[in-house]
């Protein structure tokens, strides 16, 4: 970033905004980068502004019972706000005075008034000076008000963020991320955009009073006829506005529905393709789009009428004011033209400025009240700690998470009741919901310094809640907790902040080289780090998107271990690690490196329990056991079934099963679910979409999965998994994740109205608490991952020294926070967020316009029709113009007398002028034909939007995964949210306005030129100057806008990142560090936005200066060249004043159109994506013998269409190579093996070795080479859809879309209810579905949030059974499963898929024992393919992963497992351990 020229600019340079010239020049010549942007002044920095407002807000809180945020804002900004308001008023007053001088000029041409002719030239000079003064007052005032609005937004952004970091977990459970993002993006934009209009709430009434006084002098009481019409029109416009809002509110729900499903499809596009559901998903979205467009059209027609009313009103105002007066008293020309000019100003004040100002105040006060409520929410209270305490003691503690879930279920119940699915047991599902039960009851234990306590228990038992209570996140309602307060924490779902690996581990604690190296070694990160070119200085994106799940988990653990604390809370830190790595880390890090520290480890592994000093087993929130391992064996022989839930499912009664399901539901929000996406959007949030996104959610959040850009969300939006991916630009690089500005308002004066913040979608209530308990990034393979994660060494030499050396004794005076200011610079900050570089030029190309016009054939005809109508209008004007001199000549003899003597009749010459004005007063006379021109245009443009959405949806659904893998989810979602909103809402009316204004200007110029040909000579250079100036400015402004929109992403992304890691942040006390990061992100955005506002003002001022020169030329040409024609001077000057406002407006509209057409460019970019080959790759080449050729083709077609294929499920793989993206490294190389029909094959390999990749390659979801045959049919000889239908799939990330159970199981509607129920019975889903009101018609929302992860897996299983697939692919089906569901899946696999070929990637040894063969993948290749007996007898990876004792049991277990009855599983300890072994391979 560079030093700003503003610092040294002179007063004149500041007044004329000349200091922006260097950046405008640079932007015109080359592409602008972040380094070209100027530093902000200290008065605009987030630190200073937030400190100022926070001080006033604290004062307000301290002094009053009922604090008001507006009082704090008033004390900070009021006087500057009023100063600019007064300047703005003076500028507006000059507009009211101009018509007086115009009247005097016209009067000076009166034949009876020759004495005044000499002063006409001075009056002309006075009129020109008024324009110059207005220009010099208005622009600095508007800029000053925009600047204050920006400062208010920055101060409130910062205040909201600081408050967010202090909120209690209970409050966070009730706030959705969509609400938070909406609070920041939607509400606060109102200050930036609206503050310049706010003063018109008092300026407009004063102006109207002044104008009415001046008009009274001309027309007496008849003045009120025109005013009455304007007031009626203002009320009519308000009514139309209300009707439009009604349609938009109805439409918001439909948009939301469409975006929720679109985001679910985009996030799970792999599953959609695997199930061959593209057509079904397209149909669902197109049906929703149809309903949405009906409402869009209604809203657009109403807005069109509203907009047209303004254009047409001018004529009526003049007509109603002048005509009655003229009929009764007669009128002179001076009065007509003066009245016309006054009415133009009056119309703007009454129908535009005043209503807009009232709306601005209404919106702003609403936003301030929302923020005020938020700032008064309950804060997190830190517990009182005793720093001298060495033990951790808990005495009889009970705690509640506040019941926040009842509303969700009530809503689900209500939604389904509304669908009239009546059913007798509507209440069954909800009746036994124990809302408000304590999450922990009566917990007591004591750990001494240096001890390790293992906490175990089934899902939902309260393990994480226990850690939260120790950290102070969950307040105990009874009992006492004692510890020193110096805590370190490792979350269950690894949280990575944007920054380097080193930053993530040190996390603001002072750096100690020896400690850092020891921790890296103990957490097995050395080898991973050595593979990166930048080593530990590699910059990670949000959520650590470039890392595997195991790497993220180890970095999170390293961060916790690096901090020197008294108590370490480790919440299931080994979840994503293979067994070898886990063993090494547990021994070297937890047992040796941290030997002298107090540790609480949440785990379910038997080996960990054996080594723990104390064991605490929780069951349903209570202590099931507390003591040592030997006591556990003696006192609780059945402990393993409680711990692992190892009873077989069949033993449970229906009631017991119901309670398990209910418990899962009751606690679902605390149970992280790797597939939870967080693109959230508040329901009203999509009134107009723009960036999140949501970002996001990317629901925001982006849920997007709002991947950044939100991302949530988006960027953002989208952008992190939530918001993060929403980047859509370096060309719009980032998320926008949040779509929120009212459509249709001008884009120029506001921050990108179709904003680029995180896009967050989803009408779902996803609380922030849920977000924190979700895994930070999709479990799916990250395509950015370095493919060469060659496996870590199988064994690390034990570090004998680790236990003896205490790395914490080398403490530097104390672990202090780093000095942040030098540490983070803006360039690094931006590097933390992935950008999708879009090659979209800075200015929209003509090719884009051409393609847009030709998308729908009727658009061309409509545009031609508009031109024809316009030519008819101009022709009519010219005809009148030809007749005009004759009429004037005929009446000239009588005109003087009648002017003096007769008052009852309008003077004939005046009449001809007036008639002429009616036909030609081009600024307002599009009356009769305007409607015929505008409505077809708006209607057709919405049809074009419909066509583009349809093409883009098809394109995305049919694009190959290798292309989709290079795009961010949030980026794709932004096209469907933000850009489609632009095409639906903003573009049609902006184009209509532009066409209307352009034609008005052309018409006015033609008329003026015909009346006074000399003026044409002045007009040509002026229009040329406008066009050149626009082209010059557009290059820079669009780039600045793009940089500004990118600058938004880090703000929303940082918010979501902070929320995801809030518990970690608070445990480490890093709030100030993150506030500083947030301020850096804000300052980065401010630098871009301030520069954009300044260059925009430079441009507007230059336009006005060109016009002032034009007006001076017109005035003096007309004064000096016109002889006796007072009417001619009147028309020329009146039209010239009218042209001024209209031409500026037209130029601004053209810039808006260009800006909005960038959305069209992005949509075209997606439409042009390559598609998957739906047809066989190698079609048979015709041979010379055409008959033989036909036979071959027919035979091949028969193979493809044979209903029985595949019949056996035999699979042969030859030389299979797979890549995630074109041109990327091969993840698998030369894989060859074959599987017999009905065989079960287990895939073995370390984390990141390519097991999931192999399953994707089977489905042709990657870039593959080689060949696979199923039952003798090669994948090259049949279509992709046919090939994929041969497989049943249970993916790692389960896909449940928003829709009924029936739709989720059978989206094409191929099966009857009877068949669906039969399959539901087979897989154990019937008891689940029957508990919901409506049963199969119950609508699942938010990714099936009312189902546990296990039930979602059963849904996938049911889909596979229904598809009657012969080959089943399972990718980690037991990950995050409760043991009961896991048993059902095992049982179903044995029964329903007994004759099928099963390929299984799994971490549980127990599941692998049922496989006949194993395929070991290592370093991208097949290392071994053998039976279990062979593998156990040789030195293999499988053998290494199993302890010697277990190995002895495996062979007999293998042989007898099928016959052995499991009804008494817990009887023998050995059998139990073996059955529940959750060790991961």
From Swiss-Prot:
Ranges of biased composition (kind: Low complexity): 1453-1464
Lipid moiety-binding region (S-palmitoyl cysteine): 523, 1396
Assigned protein family: Belongs to the ABC transporter superfamily. ABCC family. CFTR transporter (TC 3.A.1.202) subfamily.
Any single GO BP term: response to endoplasmic reticulum stress
Identification of the protein by name: Cystic fibrosis transmembrane conductance regulator
PROSITE patterns: ABC_TM1F, ABC_TRANSPORTER_1, ABC_TRANSPORTER_2
SMART domains cross-referenced by the UniProt entry: AAA (SM00382)
Modified residues (Phosphoserine): 548, 659, 669, 685, 699, 711, 736, 767, 790, 795, 813, 1457
Cytoplasmic topological segments: 1-77, 147-195, 244-298, 359-858, 940-990, 1035-1095, 1152-1481
Stated role: Epithelial ion channel that plays an important role in the regulation of epithelial ion and water transport and fluid homeostasis. Mediates the transport of chloride ions across the cell membrane. Possesses an intrinsic ATPase activity and utilizes ATP to gate its channel; the passive flow of anions through the channel is gated by cycles of ATP binding and hydrolysis by the ATP-binding domains. The ion channel is also permeable to HCO(3)(-); selectivity depends on the extracellular chloride concentration.
Superkingdom: Eukaryota
Record's keyword terms, sorted: ATP-binding, Cell membrane, Chloride, Chloride channel, Endoplasmic reticulum, Endosome, Glycoprotein, Ion channel, Ion transport, Isomerase, Isopeptide bond, Lipoprotein, Membrane, Nucleotide-binding, Nucleus, Palmitate, Phosphoprotein, Repeat, Transmembrane, Transmembrane helix, Transport, Ubl conjugation
Record: residues binding ATP 2: 1220, 1245-1252
Assembly description: Monomer; does not require oligomerization for channel activity. May form oligomers in the membrane. Interacts with SLC26A3, SLC26A6 and NHERF1. Interacts with SHANK2. Interacts with MYO6. Interacts (via C-terminus) with GOPC (via PDZ domain); this promotes CFTR internalization and thereby decreases channel activity. Interacts with SLC4A7 through NHERF1. Found in a complex with MYO5B and RAB11A. Interacts with ANO1. Interacts with SLC26A8. Interacts with AHCYL1; the interaction increases CFTR activity. Interacts with CSE1L.
Biased composition (Acidic residues): 1471-1481
Record's comment on post-translational modification: N-glycosylated.
Record-annotated membrane-spanning stretches: 78-98, 123-146, 196-216, 223-243, 299-319, 340-358, 859-879, 919-939, 991-1011, 1014-1034, 1096-1116, 1131-1151
Gene of this entry: CFTR
